[in-house]
Amino acid sequence: MISLIQLLKEAVAEPKAIILAGAPGAGKGYILRGLDLAGLKILNVDDIYVPMLQKANVTLDLKNATPEERSEQAKQMAAANKQFKGDVEATIEGKESFILDGTGASYNQTAKLKNELEEAGYKVMMLYVYTDLERSLTQNQDRYEKSEGKDRSLAPAIVMRTWKDVTDNLPKYADLFGNNFIAVANTLDNRMEDIEKIIKKYLTPFKPTGTKPKTPAQQKRSDERKAKDKEEIQTMLSDDFIYDVIEYTMSKEEAQMRIEKFLNS
């Protein structure tokens, strides 16, 4: 079988970009390796951000970070995003084929990038990796320890919010990318289905301390947003919703064939 790397080399006249989407802990790296795509150029802001945190002597265990560490993390993320943007622009200017490894939490930013890539002469595909909320939170919670401190764990509240946004975007991405949309599922066999129990188990133990007090108006808006998020997430945890999501997905073998066809087109 012709390798995907060979296909890319033969199609240098028309660069290809694969935008990777999925919540933290969805197993995007695992899926990439299973699809024989690991040899392609991969752009991931974490490859810049994590070394910056290490150089600044800031913990990668972001779920347990102090207020001072959270402040430094935000500073380093801003710097990493600036450098990452330059790397993406240079790759596009060089007409290199690549994989953009992100979450896809922002539909508007992703749609804008797709348009910019197409205007630059790229053919663009999305590879979307769906996972359930509990797996996303579990993988994130264990990542720092399992990597022996070499990989970062995010604040679980951020993971849950990102999961909600990227899951909500699935049908919109399917419509945006059309035939160039591929989705695979990577889920737990048994999962919790009650949002309050999930919050109690995965979020409450890591609730940030030392945060700046909110004004009554700010607290009201925050409470309303959290209530709305919980209601939406509870719907997303239902069997009916998950069955609808799975309808968009395909086997890894079919995904492999679709990607090969895309790269060879």
Regions found by a protein language model. Give the residues of each.
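Phosphate-binding P-loop
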Residues: 11-15, 90-93
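Conserved phosphate-donor/acceptor-positioning beta-strand/loop module used by diverse small-molecule
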Residues: 118-140
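Short hydrophobic/aromatic beta-strand immediately N-terminal to the Walker A/P-loop
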Residues: 17-19
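Conserved glycine(s) of the Walker
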Residues: 27
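Conserved substrate/cofactor phosphate-moiety recognition/catalytic segment
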Residues: 30-96, 108
